[in-house]
Regions:
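Intrinsically disordered, low-complexity regions
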Residues: 8, 25, 29, 37-43, ...
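Intrinsic disorder/low-complexity signal
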Residues: 12, 47-48, 53, 83, ...
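Enriched for short, Lys/Arg-rich terminal
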Residues: 62-127
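Generic cytosolic/nucleocytoplasmic N-terminal low-complexity/intrinsically disordered segments
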Residues: 1, 54, 93-94
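A short, surface-exposed loop/turn module that caps and links secondary-structure elements
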Residues: 34-65
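Alpha-helix capping and helix-coil boundary motifs
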Residues: 14, 36-43, 90-91, 112
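Arg/Lys-rich, positively charged N-terminal/basic patches that mediate binding to nucleic acids
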Residues: 1-34, 115-127
Length: 127
């Protein structure tokens, strides 16, 4: 599995935030793989807030908590050249009950995942 990120801001973040985002991506990939082992494709995953919390166009929100940090990751899952790809379009560190990230994520509704992939940055590989 390869992790790509669409936003350049990732590289300006503190190392602990970068590590948390990568850890969240690996956790998400493990959950998706668990479904695939049960012959349930990503497009058929419904009613599981731990994988697809909210939908924004062709992207989904993944909620992840590490220590006191609450992450919201806007992602899509692709298979390119027989490789699993998690494409992170955006992310937010959520503070208290602030839901401003929803409007930020909604702004990406019209983004085509393949076009975003072509302009994304490779950040990690995980199995």
């Amino acid at each position: 599995m390869n992790i790509y990120i669409y936003t350049k801001d990732f590289f300006k973040e503190k190392s602990e935030i970068q590590k948390a985002i990568l850890q969240a991506s690996k956790c998400l990939h493990a959950k998706i793989k668990n479904y695939e082992q049960q012959n349930i494709s990503f497009s058929k995953i419904f009613n599981d807030d731990s994988v697809k919390y909210d939908k924004h166009g062709q992207f989904f929100t993944f909620k992840y908590r590490i220590a006191t940090m609450q992450l919201r990751i806007l992602y899509t899952y692709l298979q390119i050249d027989e490789h699993d790809v998690i494409l992170i379009a955006d992310y937010v560190i959520k503070k208290k009950n602030n839901k401003n990230y929803i409007s930020r994520f909604d702004a990406i509704n019209t983004l085509n995942p393949m076009a975003a992939y072509e302009r994304s940055y490779y950040v990690a590989s995980a199995s």
